[in-house]
Amino acid sequence: MSGTPDDGDIGLIIAVKRLAAAKTRLAPVFSAQTRENVVLAMLVDTLTAAAGVGSLRSITVITPDEAAAAAAAGLGADVLADPTPEDDPDPLNTAITAAERVVAEGASNIVVLQGDLPALQTQELAEAISAARHHRRSFVADRLGTGTAVLCAFGTALHPRFGPDSSARHRRSGAVELTGAWPGLRCDVDTPADLTAARQLGVGPATARAVAHR
C-alpha cells in the first residue's frame, strides 16, 4: 500500500506478533487454530479499513509471521520481517522502532495502528489523524482507557510506549490524548468481552467469517 507523494503524507505502521502466540486470552472461546484465524482476519479487516484513508502515503506491516506477512502483502501493504530477537524484553516497541526507521525514509509523519481493530471504520481513522495534525505527538486510548489504539508523530520521533498501561505511559511521555468518540478505532480485541463489544459495533467481513467457524 504505497503511493506517490501526492497520495498522502503519512506512513502507517502495524506490528503483528506470531499468530500462534497472539491473543491467548481468547483461548477460552476458540481453539488454537481458530484463534489464529481470527487474529489474521482482524488484521485483514483493520488493513482494509485503513487503506481507505486518503492521507496515508504507505501502510507497512512488520511481523515475524509468514501467514500475516502474506495476508498483508496480498492487500498491498509493504511488509518488513521483524528483526526483534526472541529474548528482547520489549519486543513490540522494538519492532515498531525498527519499522519507524524504514518508514521515516519516505514519510516524516508516522502513525502506529493496532492490528486488532475489526470494527474500525475508515472515517474514524481519518478523523483521528486530522485531529493529530494539531500536535507533535498524540494518541488514542482504547475503549477501556488503559491501552493505546493509535500513536501519531508529526515531524518527530514516535517514542512508542506500548504494553501494559500504555495510555498512561504515552501521556507521561508528553503525547497528547485525542478525545474523539471513534468507537471502532478504540475497540481493540484482547479478550472475549472485547470481541463481544466489537461484534456489537459490527466487525468486518473477514472477522465475521472467522468467528462463525469456531
Curated annotation (Swiss-Prot):
Pathway: Cofactor biosynthesis; coenzyme F420 biosynthesis. Its EC number is 2.7.7.105. Guanylyltransferase that catalyzes the activation of phosphoenolpyruvate (PEP) as enolpyruvoyl-2-diphospho-5'-guanosine, via the condensation of PEP with GTP. It is involved in the biosynthesis of coenzyme F420, a hydride carrier cofactor. InterPro entries: CofC, Nucleotide-diphossugar_trans. One of its GO terms (molecular function) is GTP binding. Phosphoenolpyruvate binds at T148, G163, S166. The keyword Transferase applies. This is Phosphoenolpyruvate guanylyltransferase. One of its GO terms (biological process) is F420-0 metabolic process. Belongs to the CofC family. It comes from Mycobacterium tuberculosis (strain ATCC 25618 / H37Rv). It catalyses: phosphoenolpyruvate + GTP + H(+) = enolpyruvoyl-2-diphospho-5'-guanosine + diphosphate. Keywords: GTP-binding, Nucleotide-binding, Nucleotidyltransferase, Transferase.
